[in-house]
């Protein structure tokens, strides 16, 4: 009997769960944002080119419907990110963990986002990507360099990952869906 109830609940949630959450995926160019999105969505690595503008995909994960906006990370496109902030419940920040030269730039972009009125209630998932490479900074090192300890008004989580293999992506998404309802 319990099994049939859980099947019924699953079907009910699939068709009648109207909860939909807007998620933006941001990061500097070449961080792996689009690769991350499609590895999560399709569980495969797709050939990518630099994103000009945005990609939009709907993704259902653990009965939670996510509208995922993948935003281009080139300098000129970063100035348009704030146009996507309205009604955003979660931000996924993808960082190239080998890019030591631009840590201060990503820190500046992160804190600019956190200060924006339309993201006041958003949760932040930070993927420390490219952990498969030998010179990758650990999540602990990135946390220190980005001064994550100073984030007081947002729930956040930093997750080591490799978008090419998928390592760490599901753990990060588990954190996101478990916290998105609370935002």
Curated annotation (Swiss-Prot):
PROSITE patterns: ARF. InterPro entries: P-loop_NTPase, Small_GTP-bd, Small_GTPase_ARF, Small_GTPase_ARF/SAR. This is ADP-ribosylation factor-like protein 5. Pfam families: Arf. GO terms for biological process: intracellular protein transport; protein localization to Golgi membrane; vesicle-mediated transport. It comes from Dictyostelium discoideum. Coiled coil: none annotated. It comes from the Eukaryota. Transmembrane segments: none annotated. GTP binds at residues 27-34, 70-74, 129-132. Keywords: GTP-binding, Nucleotide-binding. SMART domains: ARF, SAR. The keyword Transcription does not apply. Belongs to the small GTPase superfamily. Arf family. One of its GO terms (molecular function) is GTPase activity. GO terms for cellular component: cytoplasm; trans-Golgi network. May bind and exchange GTP and GDP.
């Amino acid at each position: 009997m319990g099994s049939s109830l859980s099947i019924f609940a699953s079907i009910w949630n699939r068709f009648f769960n109207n909860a939909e959450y807007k998620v933006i995926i941001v990061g500097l160019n070449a961080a792996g944002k689009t690769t991350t999105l499609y590895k999560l969505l399709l569980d495969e690595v797709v050939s990518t080119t630099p994103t000009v503008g945005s990609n939009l995909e709907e993704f259902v994960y653990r009965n939670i419907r996510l509208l995922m906006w993948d935003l281009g990370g080139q300098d000129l496109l970063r100035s348009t990110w704030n146009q996507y902030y309205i009604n955003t419940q979660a931000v996924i920040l993808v960082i190239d963990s080998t890019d030591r030269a631009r840590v201060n730039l990503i820190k500046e972009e992160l804190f600019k986002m956190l200060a924006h009125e339309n993201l006041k209630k958003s949760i932040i998932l930070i993927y420390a990507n490219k952990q498969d490479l030998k010179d990758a900074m650990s999540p602990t090192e990135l946390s220190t360099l980005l001064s994550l300890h100073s984030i007081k008004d947002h729930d956040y989580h930093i997750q080591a990952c490799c978008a090419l293999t998928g390592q760490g992506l599901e753990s990060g998404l588990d954190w996101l869906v478990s916290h998105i309802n609370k935002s």
